[in-house]
Amino acid sequence: MANTEFYFNVDSGYLEGLVRGFKGGILRSTDYLNLAQCETLEDLKLHLQSTDYGSFLANETRQLTVSIIDQRLKDKLMAEFHYFRNHAFEPLATFLDFITYSYMIDNIILLITGTLHQRPISELVPKCHPLGSFEQMEAVNIAQTPAELFNAIIVDTPLADFFQDCLSENDMDEMNIEIMRNKLYKSYLEAFYKFCKKLGGTTEEIMCPILEFEADRRAFVITINSFGTELNKEEREKLYPTCGRLFPEGLRMLGNADDQDQVKTTAEYYAEYKALFEGVGIGTGEKTLEDKFFEHEVKMNVLAFNNQFHFGVFYAYVKLKEQECRNIVWIAECISQRHRTKINNYIPIL
C-alpha cells in the first residue's frame, strides 16, 4: 500500500468507510415505485420506515405535512454530516466546511429576498437549510446594502473571502440580490476548486470534474435566465465561474449569446453538454434542462464511489442525499395535492 493511502486510512479511513455504509442506504428505484403508490402522507411515512430512514418521523405528533417531511429529511442529513465534521482531521475538516458554504450562500440570499418582500425573519429562518446555518443569520434584515451586510454580518463568517466582489452601495433590489448570489457562487466554486487542486491525488481527480460541471452549469443557467432582463452582456460575463471546461472560449460564446439557440450552439462544442441539451423538451412528461443537469450531477456523484482513498465521497454523498430529499418531497407534494400525473418526475439515483 502506498504511503498516501496508508496515511489517508489513519486519519480518514473510518469516516470513508462510514460514508460508504450510509451510501448503501440510499433509496433505489423499487423504493421510489413503492412511494409513488402511496395514497396519503401517512402511507409514505410507513413505507419510509422500511428503509434506512427508519423511524425518523416517529416522534412527530403534529399532522404530517410536506414541509414537516422536508424538515426531518434535512435534519437527518445534518446529523450525519455533523458526525463526519466532528470526527474529521485536517484537511478533511476544511473540505467538509467547503461543502457547507454553498448552503450558507443560499440561506443569506433567501433571508435577504424574504426581507425585501416584508416577510418576518422568524418565518424565514425555519426555511433555511440547516447545513448552512450560522449565528448571525437572523440579523440579515438590518442591512440595506451589500456593504452594510458585509460589515454587520458576513465579516465574521467563512463567506467573508467570497464577498470581496460583492461590495457595493447599491440598494438590495431583486436584480442586485441575484447578481450577489452569482458573484458569491463564482468566488466559492473557484476557491473550492483551487483547494481540491492543492489536495491533489484521487481527491483532485474526482472533485475537479464535478466542480467543473457545477461551474459550467451555473454559466449556462445564468445566461438563459438573463434573457429578457436588464442585465447586460458585460455584467453577465463577470458572473461566470472560470474553473469549468467552458473557460475561456465557451464562456466568451455564452457572453455573446442573445437567445437559447445560441446557448445550445455553445453546448454543441462540448460532447458532454451537447447530449444534455439534445434531450430537452417542453411537452408534458418531457425532461427540462434542469432535470438533465440534475441527472448528470447524480451520475458523476455515483461514480465518485468507484474510487477509494479520497474526500470526494463525502461531497458526493451529501449531493446524492440532497437529490433524494428533493425526490421524496416531490412525491409527497404530488400525493398531498392529489396531482398524480407527474408523480414519477423524480430523478432516480441507483
From Swiss-Prot:
Any one GO MF annotation of this record: proton-transporting ATPase activity, rotational mechanism
Coiled coil: none
Pfam family, one: vATP-synt_AC39
Xref: SUPFAM superfamilies: V-type ATP synthase subunit C
Statement: the UniProt record of this protein carries the keyword Protein transport: no
The keyword Iron appears for this protein: no
Gene3D superfamilies referenced in this protein's UniProt entry, alphabetically: ATP synthase (C/AC39) subunit, domain 3, V-type ATP synthase subunit C domain
Lineage: superkingdom: Eukaryota
InterPro entries for the chain: ATPase_csu/dsu_sf, ATPase_V0-cplx_csu/dsu, ATPase_V0-cplx_dsu, V-type_ATPase_csu/dsu, V-type_ATPase_csu/dsu_dom_3
Listed GO CC annotations: proton-transporting V-type ATPase, V0 domain
Keyword line: Hydrogen ion transport, Ion transport, Transport
Summary of the function given for this chain in its UniProt record: Subunit of the V0 complex of vacuolar(H+)-ATPase (V-ATPase), a multisubunit enzyme composed of a peripheral complex (V1) that hydrolyzes ATP and a membrane integral complex (V0) that translocates protons. V-ATPase is responsible for acidifying and maintaining the pH of intracellular compartments and in some cell types, is targeted to the plasma membrane, where it is responsible for acidifying the extracellular environment. May play a role in coupling of proton transport and ATP hydrolysis. Regulator of osteoclast fusion and bone formation.
Family of the protein in this entry: Belongs to the V-ATPase V0D/AC39 subunit family.
Name of the protein in its database record: V-type proton ATPase subunit d 2
Species the sequence originates in: Xenopus tropicalis
Gene name as annotated: atp6v0d2
